[in-house]
Each structure stands twice: as structure tokens, then as C-alpha cells.
Design a protein with these regions (language model features):
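Short runs within selected transmembrane alpha-helices of multi-pass transporters and secretion channels
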Residues: 72-75, 144-162, 170-181, 199-214, ...
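Alpha-helical transmembrane segments and their lipid-water interface positions
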Residues: 28, 32, 36-43, 68-75, ...
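Small-residue-rich hydrophobic transmembrane alpha-helices
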Residues: 54-114, 151-170, 266, 278-338, ...
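Transmembrane helical elements of multi-pass membrane transporters/channels
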Residues: 20-39, 143, 177, 206-210, ...
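Short alpha-helical transmembrane segments in multi-pass integral membrane proteins
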Residues: 1-22, 82-147, 191-248, 306-371, ...
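Helix-terminus/linker motif at the lipid-water interface of multi-pass membrane proteins
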Residues: 30, 34-55, 124-131, 187-194, ...
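N-terminal transmembrane alpha-helices
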Residues: 9-49, 62-77, 81, 106-113, ...
Length: 456
């Protein structure tokens, strides 16, 4: 397997490398989306209780996002450093970084699972769950928590497969779990009659299969192989751990703040619009995941190319990779935004056929995505900052848009400006324009001068 076709970061063209990494990544991200989307589609179609159950499971999303955020803290934090040191030809250091990421990920996975078991019910109540919603949300999340460690391994270690150029293997690791989930969901939900709990069972079994494949490849077949740190290695890897957490904090904060925004939105919507609007928000969040999936693929595909060439001191390659990244992201978003505005009913019906829900969701969806194209600027800036190890900028802009703009607006617009539910959905486009523009301009003003100096 070491002789299989890989992306040649050293000699391949920048455009070819980005496309070679992005296309398998796109397939992987689309398949990965099935883990959550398929659950929601099937749950929404459970007879009599589908809409209620969908809203209840939506209350679990912040917990799931938190688990994913910790996975990416170590995976997305470690993989760019891993690529930078590979670019510098310091492979022993690269392996130590990968081992450190893996060890921290495993410890964190067990810890999060135990915390979840102890506090899941009060957490769901804080997130806005009514006694009726808890009937569906609590069993779902308790089962999901059993698969915390496999979920974190499959998500957190996959970037190290892609960072070694095995983009097809990275895609396959996701495909295994996604296809299994697609097959197991109807079996456990409808055939065996487990309902919402069946969706959770199908998900954790699928994630376990994916994690097993990732571990098999990274421990047996990849060029640089992973293992847990030995006790005597821990002191010398403390510095790497700090760097990993520091760099991974940007993506970690973005995902945690996504949960924070979801919690705030659900709390305000429960007061201003009731349970029906929590279901609307669940559908909008699902559509956002759907349309953002290719964006994540493009960003994650370009990231190792940016990191490797930055580590190898090739400023022209870094600049070209950034330009290609920007064009791909902008073109994709222009097409997607047009679809959202022109055919919102089609996208909403993927998740629910409830006519009452559809009427409210169409209006809310258009409001929420009104300035979605400005979100590109945030994605491009964040990807460049993370890939080039610009920790402070990456962390700052992760906080700026969500914590300092969206959250205050989520309360200010519905209450102080008396906009009701409309204010909740319009807080997003306002933050996209402000936060995205500032992030992109800052990236241009800081990174381009550094690359010019590197050329000299």
C-alpha cells in the first residue's frame, strides 16, 4: 500500500495537487454528511412523531458539535504542523506530532464520554429541551455518547492520512462509515422499530467501522505510522502538545461557537416562535451543513498544500495555492447561493414534507443565507491562517464573528429591535458581511508581505 498512488507535494503542480486532494476530500465530506443528514431525513419521517422528534434531536446537535470540535482540535491542529515539518524534511518530528495528537485525542474521547453520561439531561434542558423533547433527545444522545471515542478517532486522525498524500484512502475511510450508516439507519429505525434510538445505534456502529479502518491504515500501511506515546516520551512532546492545541484552537473555537449560536438561537426561538421554529432552525442548520460540505472539502484539500510549501519556503507556490483556493470557493458559493434563493422549497423538502413547517422555513432560509457569499472571505482567511501556523489570527477571527457579532445580534435584533424570529435569522448575514470582510482584508495585509520577504 505504500506504493499506491499518492499526491506528490514535492514535485507536483500546485493546481494538480489541490484538485487531487480536493476531489477525494469532496466525496469524503459528502459521505460524512450522511452520518447526520440521513439520521434527520429518516427521523423526520417516523410516523406521527417525525417533526417533534426532529426538533428534539436538533437539541442534541450542540453536544455532537462539541465532540467534533475536540476531534478537530487535535486533528486539524496537528495535521498542518505535521505537513510543515514534512516540508522541512523533519519526518521524526512530524511523527512525534502525529503521535501526540493521537494520544491527546484518545484521552479526551474517554473524558468527554464520561462527562456526557453524567450531565446529558441537565445540558439538554439548558439547551432548551422541554419535557416532551427530552423523551426523544435524551435516549438519542446517551446512545450516541457510547461512540464518542470511535467518532473522534475517525474524524481527528483522518487529516493525517490526507497529509501524507493518501487522499483516496482518506475518502475510503469516510465512505465505509457513511455507507454503513445509510444501510443501518432504516434497519434500526423502521424494521426493528427502535425509532430515534435506532438512528443513534446505526451512527455509532458506522463510526466504529470507520475508526477501525483509520487505525488499521495509520498503524500498518501508511508511510509514517501512528501509535500512542510511551510514558517516557510525554515530557519531550509537551511542547508539541501546546502547539497542536494552540493551532487547533481556531477550528475548535469556530465549532464551539457554532454550538453556542445554536443554543442561543433555540432559546430565543422557543420564546418568540415556539417549537415549530426550533424545527425550522434544525432544517436550516442541516441545509447549511449540506451546502458547506464542498467548502470544507476545498479548504481541507488546499490546507496541506499550503502548509507543505510554506514549510519548504516556496512563497510562489503558497500564493498560487491561496489564489486557486479563493477562486474555487467563490465560484462554488455563487452557484449554491443562487440555488438557495431560487429553489428553497426543494432543499427544505429533503428534510420535511410538513406543509406548515415549509411555509415558515422558506422565508427563514432566505433570510439566513442572504449574505452567505461573504462567508467565503472568512473561510479563505481562516484556512490560510491555520495552514501557515498563524495561531493568533486564526483564534481571533474564530471568536470575532460568532461570539462578538452573531450572539449579541441574536438577542439584540429580536428583542431590542422588536424583529422577533426574523431577527434571529438575519443576525447571520449581518455577521457574515462584517466578520468575513475584516478577516479577509487582514489576511491579505499580513500574509502577502511575509511571502514577499520570503522570496528575497
Amino acid at each position: 500500500m505504500n506504493k499506491m498512488k499518492r499526491i506528490d507535494f514535492e514535485n507536483g503542480s500546485v493546481t494538480g495537487n489541490i484538485l487531487g486532494a480536493t476531489l477525494p476530500m469532496l466525496v469524503a465530506q459528502i459521505l460524512n454528511l450522511l452520518y447526520n443528514i440521513v439520521d434527520r431525513v429518516y427521523i423526520a419521517r417516523i410516523p406521527k412523531v417525525g417533526t417533534t422528534a426532529l426538533g428534539a434531536v436538533g437539541l442534541c446537535f450542540p453536544i455532537i458539535v462539541i465532540i467534533t470540535a475536540f476531534s478537530n482540535l487535535f486533528g486539524s491542529g496537528g495535521a498542518p504542523l505535521f505537513s510543515i515539518y514534512r516540508g522541512k524534511k523533519q519526518e521524526n518530528t512530524a511523527v512525534q506530532i502525529m503521535d501526540t495528537s493521537f494520544s491527546m485525542l484518545c484521552i479526551c474521547g474517554v473524558f468527554l464520554m464520561l462527562i456526557g453520561f453524567l450531565f446529558a439531561r441537565p445540558i439538554l434542558v439548558v439547551f432548551g429541551a422541554s419535557s416532551n423533547a427530552l423523551t426523544y433527545a435524551y435516549p438519542y444522545i446517551m446512545i450516541y455518547l457510547i461512540g464518542t471515542l470511535p467518532s473522534m478517532i475517525s474524524i481527528g486522525m483522518n487529516p493525517f492520512i490526507n497529509a501524507q498524500g493518501y487522499s483516496t484512502i482518506g475518502m475510503l475511510s469516510v465512505a465505509i462509515g457513511a455507507v454503513a450508516n445509510l444501510l443501518l439507519d432504516p434497519l434500526f429505525i423502521f424494521v426493528l422499530g427502535f425509532g430515534v434510538q435506532g438512528a443513534a445505534i446505526a451512527t455509532i456502529l458506522s463510526q466504529t467501522l470507520s475508526a477501525a479502518f483509520v487505525l488499521f491504515f495509520l498503524t500498518r500501511k501508511s508511510e509514517l505510522r501512528v501509535r500512542l506515546l510511551r510514558k517516557n516520551e510525554v515530557p519531550q512532546c509537551t511542547g508539541y502538545a501546546k502547539d497542536i492545541v494552540s493551532l487547533g484552537s481556531a477550528g475548535f473555537i469556530m465549532q464551539l461557537t457554532n454550538s453556542l449560536v445554536t443554543i442561543c438561537c433555540n432559546n430565543v426561538l422557543s420564546v418568540t416562535g415556539g417549537n415549530i421554529y426550533i424545527s425550522v432552525m434544525t432544517i436550516i442548520s442541516s441545509i447549511r451543513q449540506l451546502v458547506e460540505t464542498p467548502l470544507h472539502a476545498i479548504n481541507e484539500g488546499a490546507s496541506p498544500i499550503l502548509s507543505y510549501n510554506y514549510g519548504a519556503c516556496r512563497p510562489k507556490h503558497v500564493r498560487k495555492a491561496g489564489a486557486i483556493l479563493s477562486v474555487m470557493v467563490l465560484v462554488y458559493t455563487a452557484v449554491t447561493w443562487s440555488m438557495i434563493i431560487l429553489i428553497p422549497e426543494f432543499l427544505i423538502r429533503i428534510f420535511s414534507s410538513d406543509t406548515v413547517l415549509l411555509k415558515d422555513a422558506v422565508i427563514a432560509l432566505k433570510q439566513y443565507f442572504a449574505a452567505f457569499i461573504f462567508m467565503d472571505l472568512q473561510y479563505i482567511g481562516q484556512t490560510v491562517f491555520k495552514s501557515l501556523n498563524k495561531k493568533k489570527f486564526a483564534i481571533f477571527f474564530s471568536l470575532l464573528r460568532k461570539v462578538f457579532i452573531v450572539v449579541p445580534l441574536t438577542y439584540l435584533m429580536p428583542y431590542a429591535l422588536h424583529m422577533g424570529t426574523k431577527g434571529v435569522f438575519l443576525a447571520e448575514p449581518v455577521s457574515n458581511v462584517i466578520g468575513g470582510s475584516i478577516c479577509f482584508v487582514t489576511m491579505l495585509c499580513t500574509v502577502l508581505p511575509e511571502l514577499k520577504k520570503m522570496e528575497k
